Regions:
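Short alpha-helical transmembrane segments in multi-pass integral membrane proteins
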Residues: 1-18, 75-143, 186-214
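Hydrophobic faces of transmembrane alpha-helices in multi-pass small-molecule transporters and flippases
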Residues: 3-34, 59, 63, 67, ...
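Transmembrane helix-bundle signature of multi-pass membrane transporters/permeases
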Residues: 18, 50-58, 95, 137, ...
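Hydrophobic alpha-helical transmembrane segments in multi-pass membrane proteins
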Residues: 21-29, 33, 65, 97-106, ...
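Helix-terminus/linker motif at the lipid-water interface of multi-pass membrane proteins
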Residues: 26-53, 59, 77, 115-125, ...
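Small-residue-rich hydrophobic transmembrane alpha-helices
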Residues: 50-113, 147-166
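Short runs within selected transmembrane alpha-helices of multi-pass transporters and secretion channels
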Residues: 68, 140-159, 165-174, 181, ...
Length: 216
């Protein structure tokens, strides 16, 4: 303990880099909590369908998230070693892997939606939930590559120490686009449960456009 010293310079840097990432995670968790509260307004079969759809989608989304997490460490190490070209190569290689996983996986799962959903929901006993989940999965898988790309760019920005961009992207995608659109489609347009997946598609395309502008 006697040799323990606090270096305000490093502590300040840790806060500058770490706080936006922490706030981003907190905002994301809170945002999905609010989405769940909005979904609770629908019938039980809708909640069941969305839950099952998210579990099936996670089969492909979690690997993409893992690649993004590893990429953050790899980019941070290479930028620290002044190996910028290597960091760029790791970004595009990770992007390629993620796009391949999500596109090929989404195409396969699109054809296997009904058998996969039948593992969790009995079509005979609960046809409404079954058909709703199959319909919901179509939209989830449609934007899955965009979700994967979003995870890669988030890992890239965090690894490069630009965590403020991660916070901006998470805020834009969830709080500026998805939540307002869900509320608007539910309460103004009144289209019911599809409000959730239409808003999801809009928010992911909006995030993709924002990412392309930042990259340019």
């Amino acid at each position: 303990w006697k040799d323990l010293q606090f270096h305000l310079k490093y502590i300040k840097t840790l806060f500058i880099v770490g706080m936006p990432a922490a706030i981003s995670q907190a905002f994301t968790s809170l945002g999905f909590l609010l989405i769940n509260s909005l979904v609770m307004a629908f019938d039980g079969y809708v909640i069941n369908a969305i839950g099952v759809g998210n579990r099936i989608n996670s089969l492909l989304l979690f690997p993409a998230m893992s690649v993004g997490t590893v990429l953050a460490t790899f980019i941070g190490q290479n930028i620290g070693a002044n190996q910028i070209s290597r960091a760029k190569k790791s970004l595009w290689f990770s992007m390629l892997i993620t796009i391949m996983i999500t596109v090929i996986g989404a195409c396969i799962l699109l054809f296997l939606r009904r058998p996969l959903v039948s593992i969790f929901i009995n079509e005979v006993d609960n046809p409404q939930a079954f058909n709703m989940c199959v319909y919901y999965l179509y939209f989830l898988l449609l934007v899955l590559p965009l979700m994967g790309i979003f995870q890669i760019w988030t890992g890239c920005f965090q690894g490069a120490g630009r965590t403020g961009l991660s916070l901006l992207l998470a805020t834009m995608r969830l709080w500026v686009l998805r939540l307002p659109f869900i509320w608007f489609l539910m309460n103004i347009i009144k289209i019911g449960p599809p409000s959730v997946w239409y808003a999801m598609v809009i928010s992911n395309f909006g995030a993709a456009i924002l990412l392309s502008l930042i990259h340019i």
